[in-house]
Amino acid sequence: LKYTQNFQSIKNNTEKPSAQEPFWNNLFLPGLDMVMLYTAIAELKPKRYVEIGSGNSTKVAHKAITEQGLKTEIISIDPMPRAEIDALANTIIRSPFEDSNFDFLEDLEENDILFVDNSHRVFPNSDATVFFLEVLPRLKKGVVVQIHDVYLPFDYPQFMCDRFYSEQYMLAAFLLANSEKYAPMIPNYYLSENKELSQIIEPIWNAIPHAVEKHGGSFWLKIEK
């Protein structure tokens, strides 16, 4: 709740935000995910913030870094060139994640953030498969990971089924097999669906002069060993 004023300054999609500004109701990053991403960066003060899949999240991250006076480096891994994102990132890797040299992710340190928002599909040599089998097990203790479009502990909702997303099943297997290493922090969808938990952050929505999406799909976890 301490960053409510910062959230109030975010424009709605009807207010003609600049190309580099985050905005509510953007169709890709729901309100709760924007709030939690900003808060995570402000609280953790990471040296590096790495995105596998960039866009609205990059704009939120840049806003948090700028307003909180941080020196966090933004590293964007995304195959789609976009001038507005390139202007916000310190390091730009414009190739599919599975074809990129991602060895540097092993050097991420405590409180660094790895924000994953990729194809969400576990297929042979897909970016999601490569992330879970070649990256996640090699991350150092203390690294914070966000995986987007995850609905755990629930299954994918009906309205998502025609997208054929499957990565949350891989995530669930990691959590069930080694909960001591992969510690859940904030499951946004569960938070938004639980009446008691959702009431805790209701003052944020009441302070924003727009109708904002209160749900989210970010699943935050921390590497504990």
Predicted regions and their residues:
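A short alpha-helical cap/connector motif
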Residues: 1-67, 71-146, 150-225
